[in-house]
Amino acid sequence: MVPQAKLVVASLILTSALIQTSEAVGGIATYWGQYTETEEGSLAEACASNLYSYINIAYLNIFGEGRYLSLNISGHCSDCTFLGEEIKACQSQGVKIFLSLGGPYGDYHLTTDGDADRVAEQLWSSFLGGSKSTGVYQPLLGDVELDGIDLDIQIGPPEEYDVLARNLKDLTKDRTRPFYLSAAPKCSAYNDSDAYLWTAVETGLFDFVWVKFYNDTSCQYNNDTAAGLDAFYRSWYDWTVSLAEGNKLLIGIPASNETDNSPLGGYIPSDVLNDQIVSVIMTSSKFGGVNVWNRYYDLKTNYSSSIILEYVNSGTKYLPLRTKFMYQNA
């Protein structure tokens, strides 16, 4: 017997999907840069794996208050300008490369609109193809024009990131290469003006929102099929109806059921993800795919491979997803 609440939530999702039916095609995103080259491989290797449509270089974790920008790409490099050639190779393969701002550690914050203005100028000049202005230009990744900026803000005050987003979109509006903004809010940040990134996401400027459905017990999958799926579905539906048309929502999940030292709640076995989640939500025009945390764990578990092989013909990065009503045999 299927719980009534479960059916109601699934019905809401499916009704929304039918209203906005489109050819739902998703991609896989991941984060690279927080482990050594021996542990997670190079950026070039990640791109050549043919697993990912989007790769976030993590992290730019010092910015704001008029300071110079600083990267923390753990164990890979101190002088990371050589990555410029790897980034260009990735882009030539169709992989979109983002620079992720924030992370769990660092010294970053925006205190005023002027602060957000300056950081936007620094990013534009250093990573996005803008003018190489003296005092602003820092070629930390070499001479590159990245595809996008990702916000994974986890510490400091939550204000001013909406201003940063507006400034970045304005600065990049005339460039030839499309510019993308992405954000990685916690699933519980929905409709919470005090939460990281909610106010920014409300601007409607974020092309990709890869919501973290992990480390957040109120809205993540919690192993028990009925209760775990209900929490996920309710949160997914809330986020779907809140996003502006054209924004894509990706499922942010860990590629392993534990970190080095402690459980990483929210892990979804790939068979559950494929058969009981993606197959239900993929008809929404806002479905954008899956964001896997992170390249290191993905290499250990081959998690992305298990998703791709379920849905994709050999040789393509994208997931043309099948239609299936989860409760057809209920």
Curated annotation (Swiss-Prot):
The keyword Signal applies. Disulfide bonds join C47-C90, C77-C80, C187-C219. This is Endochitinase Ziz m 1.0101. Residues 1-24 form the signal peptide. It is an enzyme of class 3 (hydrolase). Keywords: Allergen, Carbohydrate metabolism, Chitin degradation, Disulfide bond, Glycosidase, Hydrolase, Plant defense, Polysaccharide degradation, Secreted, Signal. GO terms for molecular function: endochitinase activity. SUPFAM superfamilies: (Trans)glycosidases (SSF51445). Defense against chitin containing fungal pathogens. Transmembrane segments: none annotated. PROSITE patterns: GH18_2. It is found in: Secreted. It holds the Pfam family Glyco_hydro_18. The keyword Magnesium does not apply. Belongs to the glycosyl hydrolase 18 family. Chitinase class II subfamily. Residues 292-301 are annotated as: Binds to IgE in 100% of the 10 patients tested allergic to Indian jujube and latex. Its EC number is 3.2.1.14. Residues 26-330 form the GH18 domain. GO terms for biological process: amino sugar metabolic process; chitin catabolic process; defense response to fungus; polysaccharide catabolic process. It comes from the Eukaryota. GO terms for cellular component: extracellular region. Residues 72-86, 300-311, 309-320 are annotated as: Binds to IgE in 70% of the 10 patients tested allergic to Indian jujube and latex. It comes from Ziziphus mauritiana.
